[in-house]
C-alpha cells in the first residue's frame, strides 16, 4: 500500500500494474524529451541565434509535422497494447462477484455453493494496534496467488467503483449492469483499495481489502467458510 509522503505508484502486484508503471515511465521520458527540445529552442531564440524574420522554412515545417506524429505513435502503440490487455479476460480459475451498496460491499464466490459475505469498514474504535484507519474491513477478499481471477462488478443502489491500485484494477459498479475485470496477483500480500466513485455521505467508508495467499491456504479458508 502507499506510504506516508509517497509520490510514486504503489508496488505493482499484477502484470497489468507492472505494464502501467512502465508506460508511465515511458510517457514521462517522452515528455522530458519534448520539454528539453522546447527549452533548447527558447534558449536559442533568447540568445538571438535564431532569426525571427524567417518567412519561409519548408524544412522546419516538415520537421514540426513529422516529429509530433512520431511522438504520438510512440505513445499510442504501448497505450493501445495495455488497453487491450486490460479488456482481455483469460479463462479464470476463480470468479468473484462484487456488489456495491451504500456503504459496503457484498462478495459472492460463484464457484462455491454457499460462499458469500458482506464487507464493512472496521470502525476506528475497533481497530487493532498496527492496522490502518479507514482501510481495514471485517471480512477480506481472499484469493489464490498466481491464478487468473475474474471479478464481476455491479451495484445495488447508486454508482460505485471497485478499485485496487496495487493490482491496476478500477471498474465502475453500475446498478442493473454487470461489468467485469480480471487480474493475477504475482506475490502474496494484502492489497488495499477503496470505492472510487462518489456515492453519498459515507463514500470514503467503503474500503476494499484483497488478500493474496498460496493455493493451499485459500482452499483451507474457503472450506472453513463454506462449512
Curated annotation (Swiss-Prot):
The chain crosses the membrane at residues 15-45, 59-86. Its main location: mitochondrion. Residues 46-58 are mitochondrial matrix. Its cofactor is Cu cation. It is a multi-pass membrane protein. The keyword 4Fe-4S does not apply. One of its GO terms (cellular component) is mitochondrial inner membrane. It catalyses: 4 Fe(II)-[cytochrome c] + O2 + 8 H(+)(in) = 4 Fe(III)-[cytochrome c] + 2 H2O + 4 H(+)(out). GO terms for biological process: ATP synthesis coupled electron transport; respiratory electron transport chain; response to oxidative stress. Binds a dinuclear copper A center per subunit. Residues 1-14, 87-227 are mitochondrial intermembrane. Cu cation A1 binds at residues 160, 195, 199, 206. InterPro entries: CcO_II, CcO_II-like_C, CcO_II_C, Copper_CuA, Cupredoxin, Cyt_c_oxidase_su2, Cyt_c_oxidase_su2_TM_dom, Cyt_c_oxidase_su2_TM_sf. PANTHER family: CYTOCHROME C OXIDASE SUBUNIT 2, CYTOCHROME C OXIDASE, SUBUNIT II. Component of the cytochrome c oxidase (complex IV, CIV), a multisubunit enzyme composed of 14 subunits. The complex is composed of a catalytic core of 3 subunits MT-CO1, MT-CO2 and MT-CO3, encoded in the mitochondrial DNA, and 11 supernumerary subunits COX4I, COX5A, COX5B, COX6A, COX6B, COX6C, COX7A, COX7B, COX7C, COX8 and NDUFA4, which are encoded in the nuclear genome. This is Cytochrome c oxidase subunit 2. It comes from Gallus gallus (Chicken). The gene is MT-CO2.
Amino acid at each position: 500500500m502507499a506510504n506516508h509522503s509517497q509520490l510514486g505508484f504503489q508496488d505493482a502486484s499484477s502484470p497489468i500494474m507492472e505494464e502501467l508503471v512502465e508506460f508511465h515511465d515511458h510517457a514521462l521520458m517522452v515528455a522530458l524529451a519534448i520539454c528539453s527540445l522546447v527549452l533548447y529552442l527558447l534558449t536559442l531564440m533568447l540568445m538571438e541565434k535564431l532569426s525571427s524574420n524567417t518567412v519561409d522554412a519548408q524544412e522546419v515545417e516538415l520537421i514540426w509535422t513529422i516529429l509530433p506524429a512520431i511522438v504520438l505513435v510512440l505513445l499510442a502503440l504501448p497505450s493501445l497494447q495495455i488497453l487491450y490487455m486490460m479488456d482481455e479476460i483469460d479463462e479464470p480459475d476463480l470468479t468473484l462477484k462484487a456488489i456495491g451498496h451504500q456503504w459496503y460491499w457484498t462478495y459472492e464466490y460463484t464457484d462455491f455453493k454457499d460462499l458469500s459475505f458482506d464487507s464493512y469498514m472496521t470502525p476506528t474504535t475497533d481497530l487493532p494496534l498496527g492496522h490502518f484507519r479507514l482501510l481495514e474491513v471485517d471480512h477480506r477478499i481472499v484469493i489464490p496467488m498466481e491464478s487468473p481471477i475474474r471479478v464481476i462488478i455491479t451495484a445495488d443502489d447508486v454508482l460505485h467503483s471497485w478499485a485496487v491500485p496495487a493490482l491496476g484494477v478500477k471498474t465502475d459498479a453500475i446498478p442493473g449492469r454487470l461489468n467485469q475485470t480480471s487480474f493475477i496477483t504475482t506475490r502474496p500480500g494484502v492489497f488495499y483499495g477503496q470505492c472510487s466513485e462518489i456515492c453519498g455521505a459515507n463514500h470514503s467508508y467503503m474500503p476494499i481489502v484483497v488478500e493474496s495467499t498460496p493455493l493451499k491456504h485459500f482452499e483451507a479458508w474457503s472450506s472453513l467458510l463454506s462449512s
